[in-house]
């Protein structure tokens, strides 16, 4: 494979302009989504919250992200990223203002629950960037989008406490979070005005039907149904964590009601997927339009172990340093752990660039193997380690984790152009499923075993990646007049 150099400061190039305005949109969604995190100590004191109530807020913040990434992916494919991203930014801004204005714990909980939709913003830009960049550049472009946008969570952690301090008073945190909401809302208006879904003269391909992926064989239909099950199981696990046997935010009736709703929703989704696929599967899909669903499944599972482990480790790493090394303050432990998130700025683009340069499957295989080794090394860290060496090991592991994420989304746009939003949404949802599963494991084991479980699961994923086909040749999409357009994926 070959790549062409991206001139990132050539704002006269429409695709470079699109990349910058889109990664910044994603950046703002993450600032808003994680705006509560650095303020939790202040919020806990202001509302006199218990530790279980704080934990419940953190769970609620991610509860809707799994289904919302699927929903947002479908909306992107149907309406286009410009409209969906701008709308999400404006709604997310209003939710942030609502959270900042909350007067009771119940209001805080509702707003954090709704914030899960904001976490789906990542999916939108994947489709937008893929429309503007050719296959030989899409890896690094998606990596820049994902890496720089993902930095929004770290930016929130670094800036919002200072902004709250500048406002001063007991309500400083409210002004800081509310201000981010206003900025997101205004940028949503700007994005709608200046963004375009495709380059001039290009066609924005859409699925024939909406509500589920179009698969091209009966075997893939059942494979697709099976791949939906873990997402519902993860939501059931989140419900269990909020139930009386754990945090107690939900009573038995509410918990059982949610379990029943999840079963009903799964049945409805099965019927919807059948409706989307029954006609063209009965007629037979032309060879030129076929793709293998295993490509989607492998990418989902790869994102499970990459992004899923990142979310889980970022959540526990400060406490890991604090508990492992005596004499560290909470602030020092947080700073040492921050190196894991900072790697996003360079690691994701590097993963995408390597994928463009040396091959998709080879890159993903090497990075997941490195990830496995990295977590096995972290499992050996104890109080006898030199702290700088522990930090270096953490950052090295983080590089493979986040470069792996970049490699996954270098491939996502090359499966089926018209369904890129849905494919990205499903992969993104699996990332959150991974976080739920890994954090659930952590609640039962010690730190060393936790890291070893991630490393062992990465070995399994490495083996599964070998079954993925290297994207090659061209994919076919149907123009509105019925003619076929071939899109290069090499």
Predicted regions and their residues:
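C-terminal ends and interior cores of transmembrane alpha-helices
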Residues: 90-103, 370-384
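Cytoplasmic membrane-interface "Motif A"-like loop-to-helix N-cap segments
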Residues: 78-89, 356-369
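Extracytoplasmic
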Residues: 17-51, 67, 72, 156, ...
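Glycine-rich segments within core transmembrane alpha-helices of 12-TM secondary carriers
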Residues: 139-164, 425-438
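Helix-breaking motifs and short loop linkers at transmembrane-helix boundaries and internal kinks
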Residues: 48, 80, 101-106, 118, ...
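Extracytoplasmic gate region of multi-pass secondary transporters
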Residues: 36-40, 228-257, 294-338
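Intracellular juxtamembrane helix-capping segments at the cytosolic ends
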Residues: 120-134, 402-416
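C-terminal membrane-cytosol helix-exit motif in multi-pass small-molecule transporters
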Residues: 182-204, 231-244, 259-278, 461-470
